[in-house]
């Protein structure tokens, strides 16, 4: 038996180790091992983290419709799970590729037995969850309701598989800015005013399934250790390294100080050293027997600077005393306890002023809270820092110039580019991501963790392929590429401006820019809705959370602020049409609340009640210190003005829809009729019926131009009517301010014969319009009246443009100019 095991071990060592791509198939393959009914065995000596992961693996088998029972059996495929040094059966295999490795797993087969082996407890756990993932259980099965497809069978394809070692040693999340969303959801879900071990157990499982290993717990109003003593124990059992945030030194949560401020005294090390050292010592006493990481240094009380000055000597004294406490409490040299110093905001000034921490301490640099790396190690001395470098990165932020808390606004490309920049400059020891409430930051979390494990899997040119693969693995649908495109397009649009910074003044309403960006979102929402109908029912909640809701919410927000911009624009011109836009603002504001209500109360059966309670409409400064979302201000215009339209020139032109005349005169037995939806823009106008003489019929358009204009060009756009009367062409006249009328023959050359067929006829009928121009002299300032008189029946007018230097030829003749009535 020993010889057989030795032979197998040699085979394993010599076999080519593949990346853990696909070793599970759902179609029969020759010599593959069936998984419909399997057994799993592990050693009682193994880590508790491994046993918990095995229990989750059994549950995952059930989720996909398969069976995995503990123990061994002659029937079905057996799975052996174990960690080097903790499972004799694993040790006997002599898996050389695992020895001395960090968090590495190997999945292989020994004959007809599947083996999942890890170099340490997390390596084994990652191997277990890799099998779960390949069976179709996404890391997001619970946190985002990723669908799980039922299977009648699955097969393990024989071979040896691994993902190697992680590129970054410490890979974690920071729950932050947790009120009101996460706190509300926890209260609704777990019935507590804080995160207890039941909540954190779900967070830890997600981190491990994503091949992460670290957490900074929420700290605004919660105290991880004090709220529930089981929290820290649960982290240790499951194999998650705990840390505390950049301003919470010595394994103490800020709330542990804030709740007992009178007892501990001032957060001032120079004046209150004795009490603060005692506070620090208690934190190290609590964590000394764990893998937990210790934040060193000190900031001011409540995530603020200690003072206006950069007191290097004081910081040196603080760190020296903290290191002394670590050594005294643990009974080990200080460098045997992992420590980090965060160069966050003003703390970087200490570094720039020459302060240096001991060689073993991780140097944690930060982004600017908006996803841009502030600095990287540059000098040879910095690059060789033995403790290594880390990055603290944000996809959630509270602070100036404006909060970003509601939904994800981080572009995939920016995150990839900046994290690649960090990694390529040697920031490879620790990556920590500020994820706010965790939801709705699901995809940035996935991308961050995948990059922390192996940042070289993708390039900047094909990073969107990561998004496609993510949705393919989680949704399991053929539309994954389209889903990914919608997701990335939405990120691109949100990258233009965050929802908290968006308002009516963001885009230019006069140039049509506002309408363009609102239309961009409207088209994206239509795409997302069409795709929703094709998503399998079991995947729709996941699709709603990650794709449809963010698109709909932002599209609606754009509609609302566009409507506010139009209301302001038209109200200035005194136009009662401003009132319609004011009503649209109210409608969109109400829809926003309904979308959030649906997310909280209806989606996934109300499972995520509370996550969409973040205020996002009504910011006046960086923070959200207002009671609730506020309806944007609008202006109502009294609708008692004359019926006619008066236009205001803008940017060197006046653009007028033909139906918006100041006055109209019809001949006996006729009337001016508006044809809705006729033409390229809004409508068209014609004197009807065509069988009656036109007489003295006329349309008059009124507008204002700036002083000093001496000449202009009038563009008259009509339907491409042919000379059906055979009178040598339909004619109309154009006159400005009572000047001598100029006659325009609009269709004399519109005949399908040479020499006009290709030059005049085909272009006009293909474009469906005839555009003629008339040059006019401008003899006065102020208000002007342009009169157009048809000389033949059957002329259909669509648009009038008066150009005095600013009109740019466009297919739709520019957006209509502002007007009043």
Language model features with spans:
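Bacterial Sec-dependent N-terminal signal peptides
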Residues: 1-24
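Contiguous, structured surface segment used for ligand recognition
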Residues: 20-165
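Intrinsic-disorder/low-complexity accessory segments
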Residues: 78-136, 198-202, 210, 249, ...
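Feature activates predominantly on carbohydrate-active enzymes
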Residues: 98-270, 288, 340-344, 354-372, ...
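C-terminal non-catalytic alpha-helical accessory regions
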Residues: 146, 150-151, 464-614, 697-699
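Gly/Pro-rich turn-and-neighbor structural signature
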Residues: 154, 219-220, 226-237, 264-386, ...
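Structured mid-domain segments that build the active-site/substrate or prosthetic-cofactor binding neighborhood
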Residues: 208, 213-216, 222, 365-371, ...
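Extracytoplasmic
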Residues: 616-821
